[in-house]
Regions:
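Cleavable N-terminal export/targeting peptides
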Residues: 1-8
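Catalytic phosphate/metal-binding cores of nucleic-acid and nucleotide-processing enzymes, i.e., regions
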Residues: 9-134
């Protein structure tokens, strides 16, 4: 998908761009829901899942003692250090995708913010409140 600047003021003409950004926001919300479950409610993680990776009370040992493992290399070492950065990166990417490109009226930015909030919230509650419910 190529995003090009345009003078077209039709909000509906940008629906693909808004949908792509909303999708990234939903993924961000889902990642945040998983992250918060892992950090604050590890007892909600299914027993059949690998505790060494999912349970933050023991997964911190996965990082090792090297400087690399304690810094940027910790990404992917456990669920907390995978879904936390994924949440932040997809949140940023969604905001960029939604706002880049054409000039718009002021209320269209507000509508995009609302779509973003609803999408993020839906992703979050799908994981935190529904999938990992007690």
């Amino acid at each position: 998908m190529t995003i090009q600047a345009t003078d077209d003021f039709s909000y509906l003409s940008r629906w693909k761009q808004t949908a792509a950004g909303a999708g990234l926001m939903a993924v961000s919300g889902a990642c945040y829901g998983i992250h918060e479950t892992v950090v604050h409610h590890p007892n909600r993680i299914p027993a059949s899942w690998d505790k060494q990776w999912w349970d933050g009370r023991i997964s911190w040992k996965n990082k090792g003692s090297s400087t690399w493992g304690r810094t940027i290399g910790s990404f992917g070492s456990d669920a907390k250090h995978t879904f936390g950065p994924l949440h932040r990166h997809t949140l940023y990417a969604g905001a960029v995708v939604i706002t880049v490109g054409s000039r718009r009226r002021w209320w269209e930015y507000g509508l995009d913010a609302l779509v973003s909030f609803v999408s993020f919230s839906a992703g979050f509650h799908a994981t935190y409140s529904l999938y990992f419910r007690e």
